[in-house]
């Protein structure tokens, strides 16, 4: 009897079939790991998700804080020393990665009177949206473009560019670059110039005069994958959205909105980034919307709030905020307001992966 009881106790302690298969699987995983392989079935739900998963967080940077802190940097480092005196607007969901969204960098650059940010070029495309100041310039591909608040300036892939401030006041603008996309593909290149400034042979507004007037310089390319216009001035764009508003051309989600376009083909200004400018009447309450492009917004005028998945971000002039991809959001305007926005939508559309949700919620 004692022998039979001992036998039963031993059987009860013996590993069952499930334990055996788990042990066999673990041993298998350890063996294949030595050959730099791993099973897809253990991670499938993480790499092929039912809906977008993002680390990007809703966040707002108020201009009072931005300006105060950027101005402080002027006493600490020169534009020449820094090459570009910029404070990165870092998304708290991706701390330490120099990203505002997963695919876009954003920062605020300041250039003081008399300073020059030296000429260079890089594979990453860049845009500037002017926040504060008057009379500083960006020189791009030989054209010196003087800037004013609300101007939208583009610097395409590998275009030589430098900045200077010939005014008597500081100039601040928002920089947005696509280098997270470029670095994902591991295709970053950059080049410094021997001189601080590039030779400029084209007058301010030269590219706009040619390419946005219905005529082209003889011999100019008939198709470009980026806009040849350097500066989309606020003075030209603001009246257009004003006319749309007066005509009642108001989207229930986006207000009276225009898209900055390549005048050659009507496409986006850059292959990796697209921008819009929207006017909202006082009292506007937008319907909910979401899309797969994480978007950076700037308040050019007015006052209001954007609610993102139930979280309200209250904004005013020159405040910058981020709406993460595939998060429901809606705008409301306490007074007539203008919002500039930029995202990676053109890149997603080129890959056939951009999606929006405009249905009732």
Residue ranges and their predicted role:
Residues 2-101, 191-192, 198-272, 276:
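A short, N-terminal "cap"/entry segment at the start of jelly-roll beta-barrel domains
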Residues 140, 146-168, 173-178, 308, ...:
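Conserved metal-binding segment of the jelly-roll/cupin
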Residues 112-149, 155-159, 289-317:
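A short beta-strand-loop-beta hairpin characteristic of the jelly-roll/cupin
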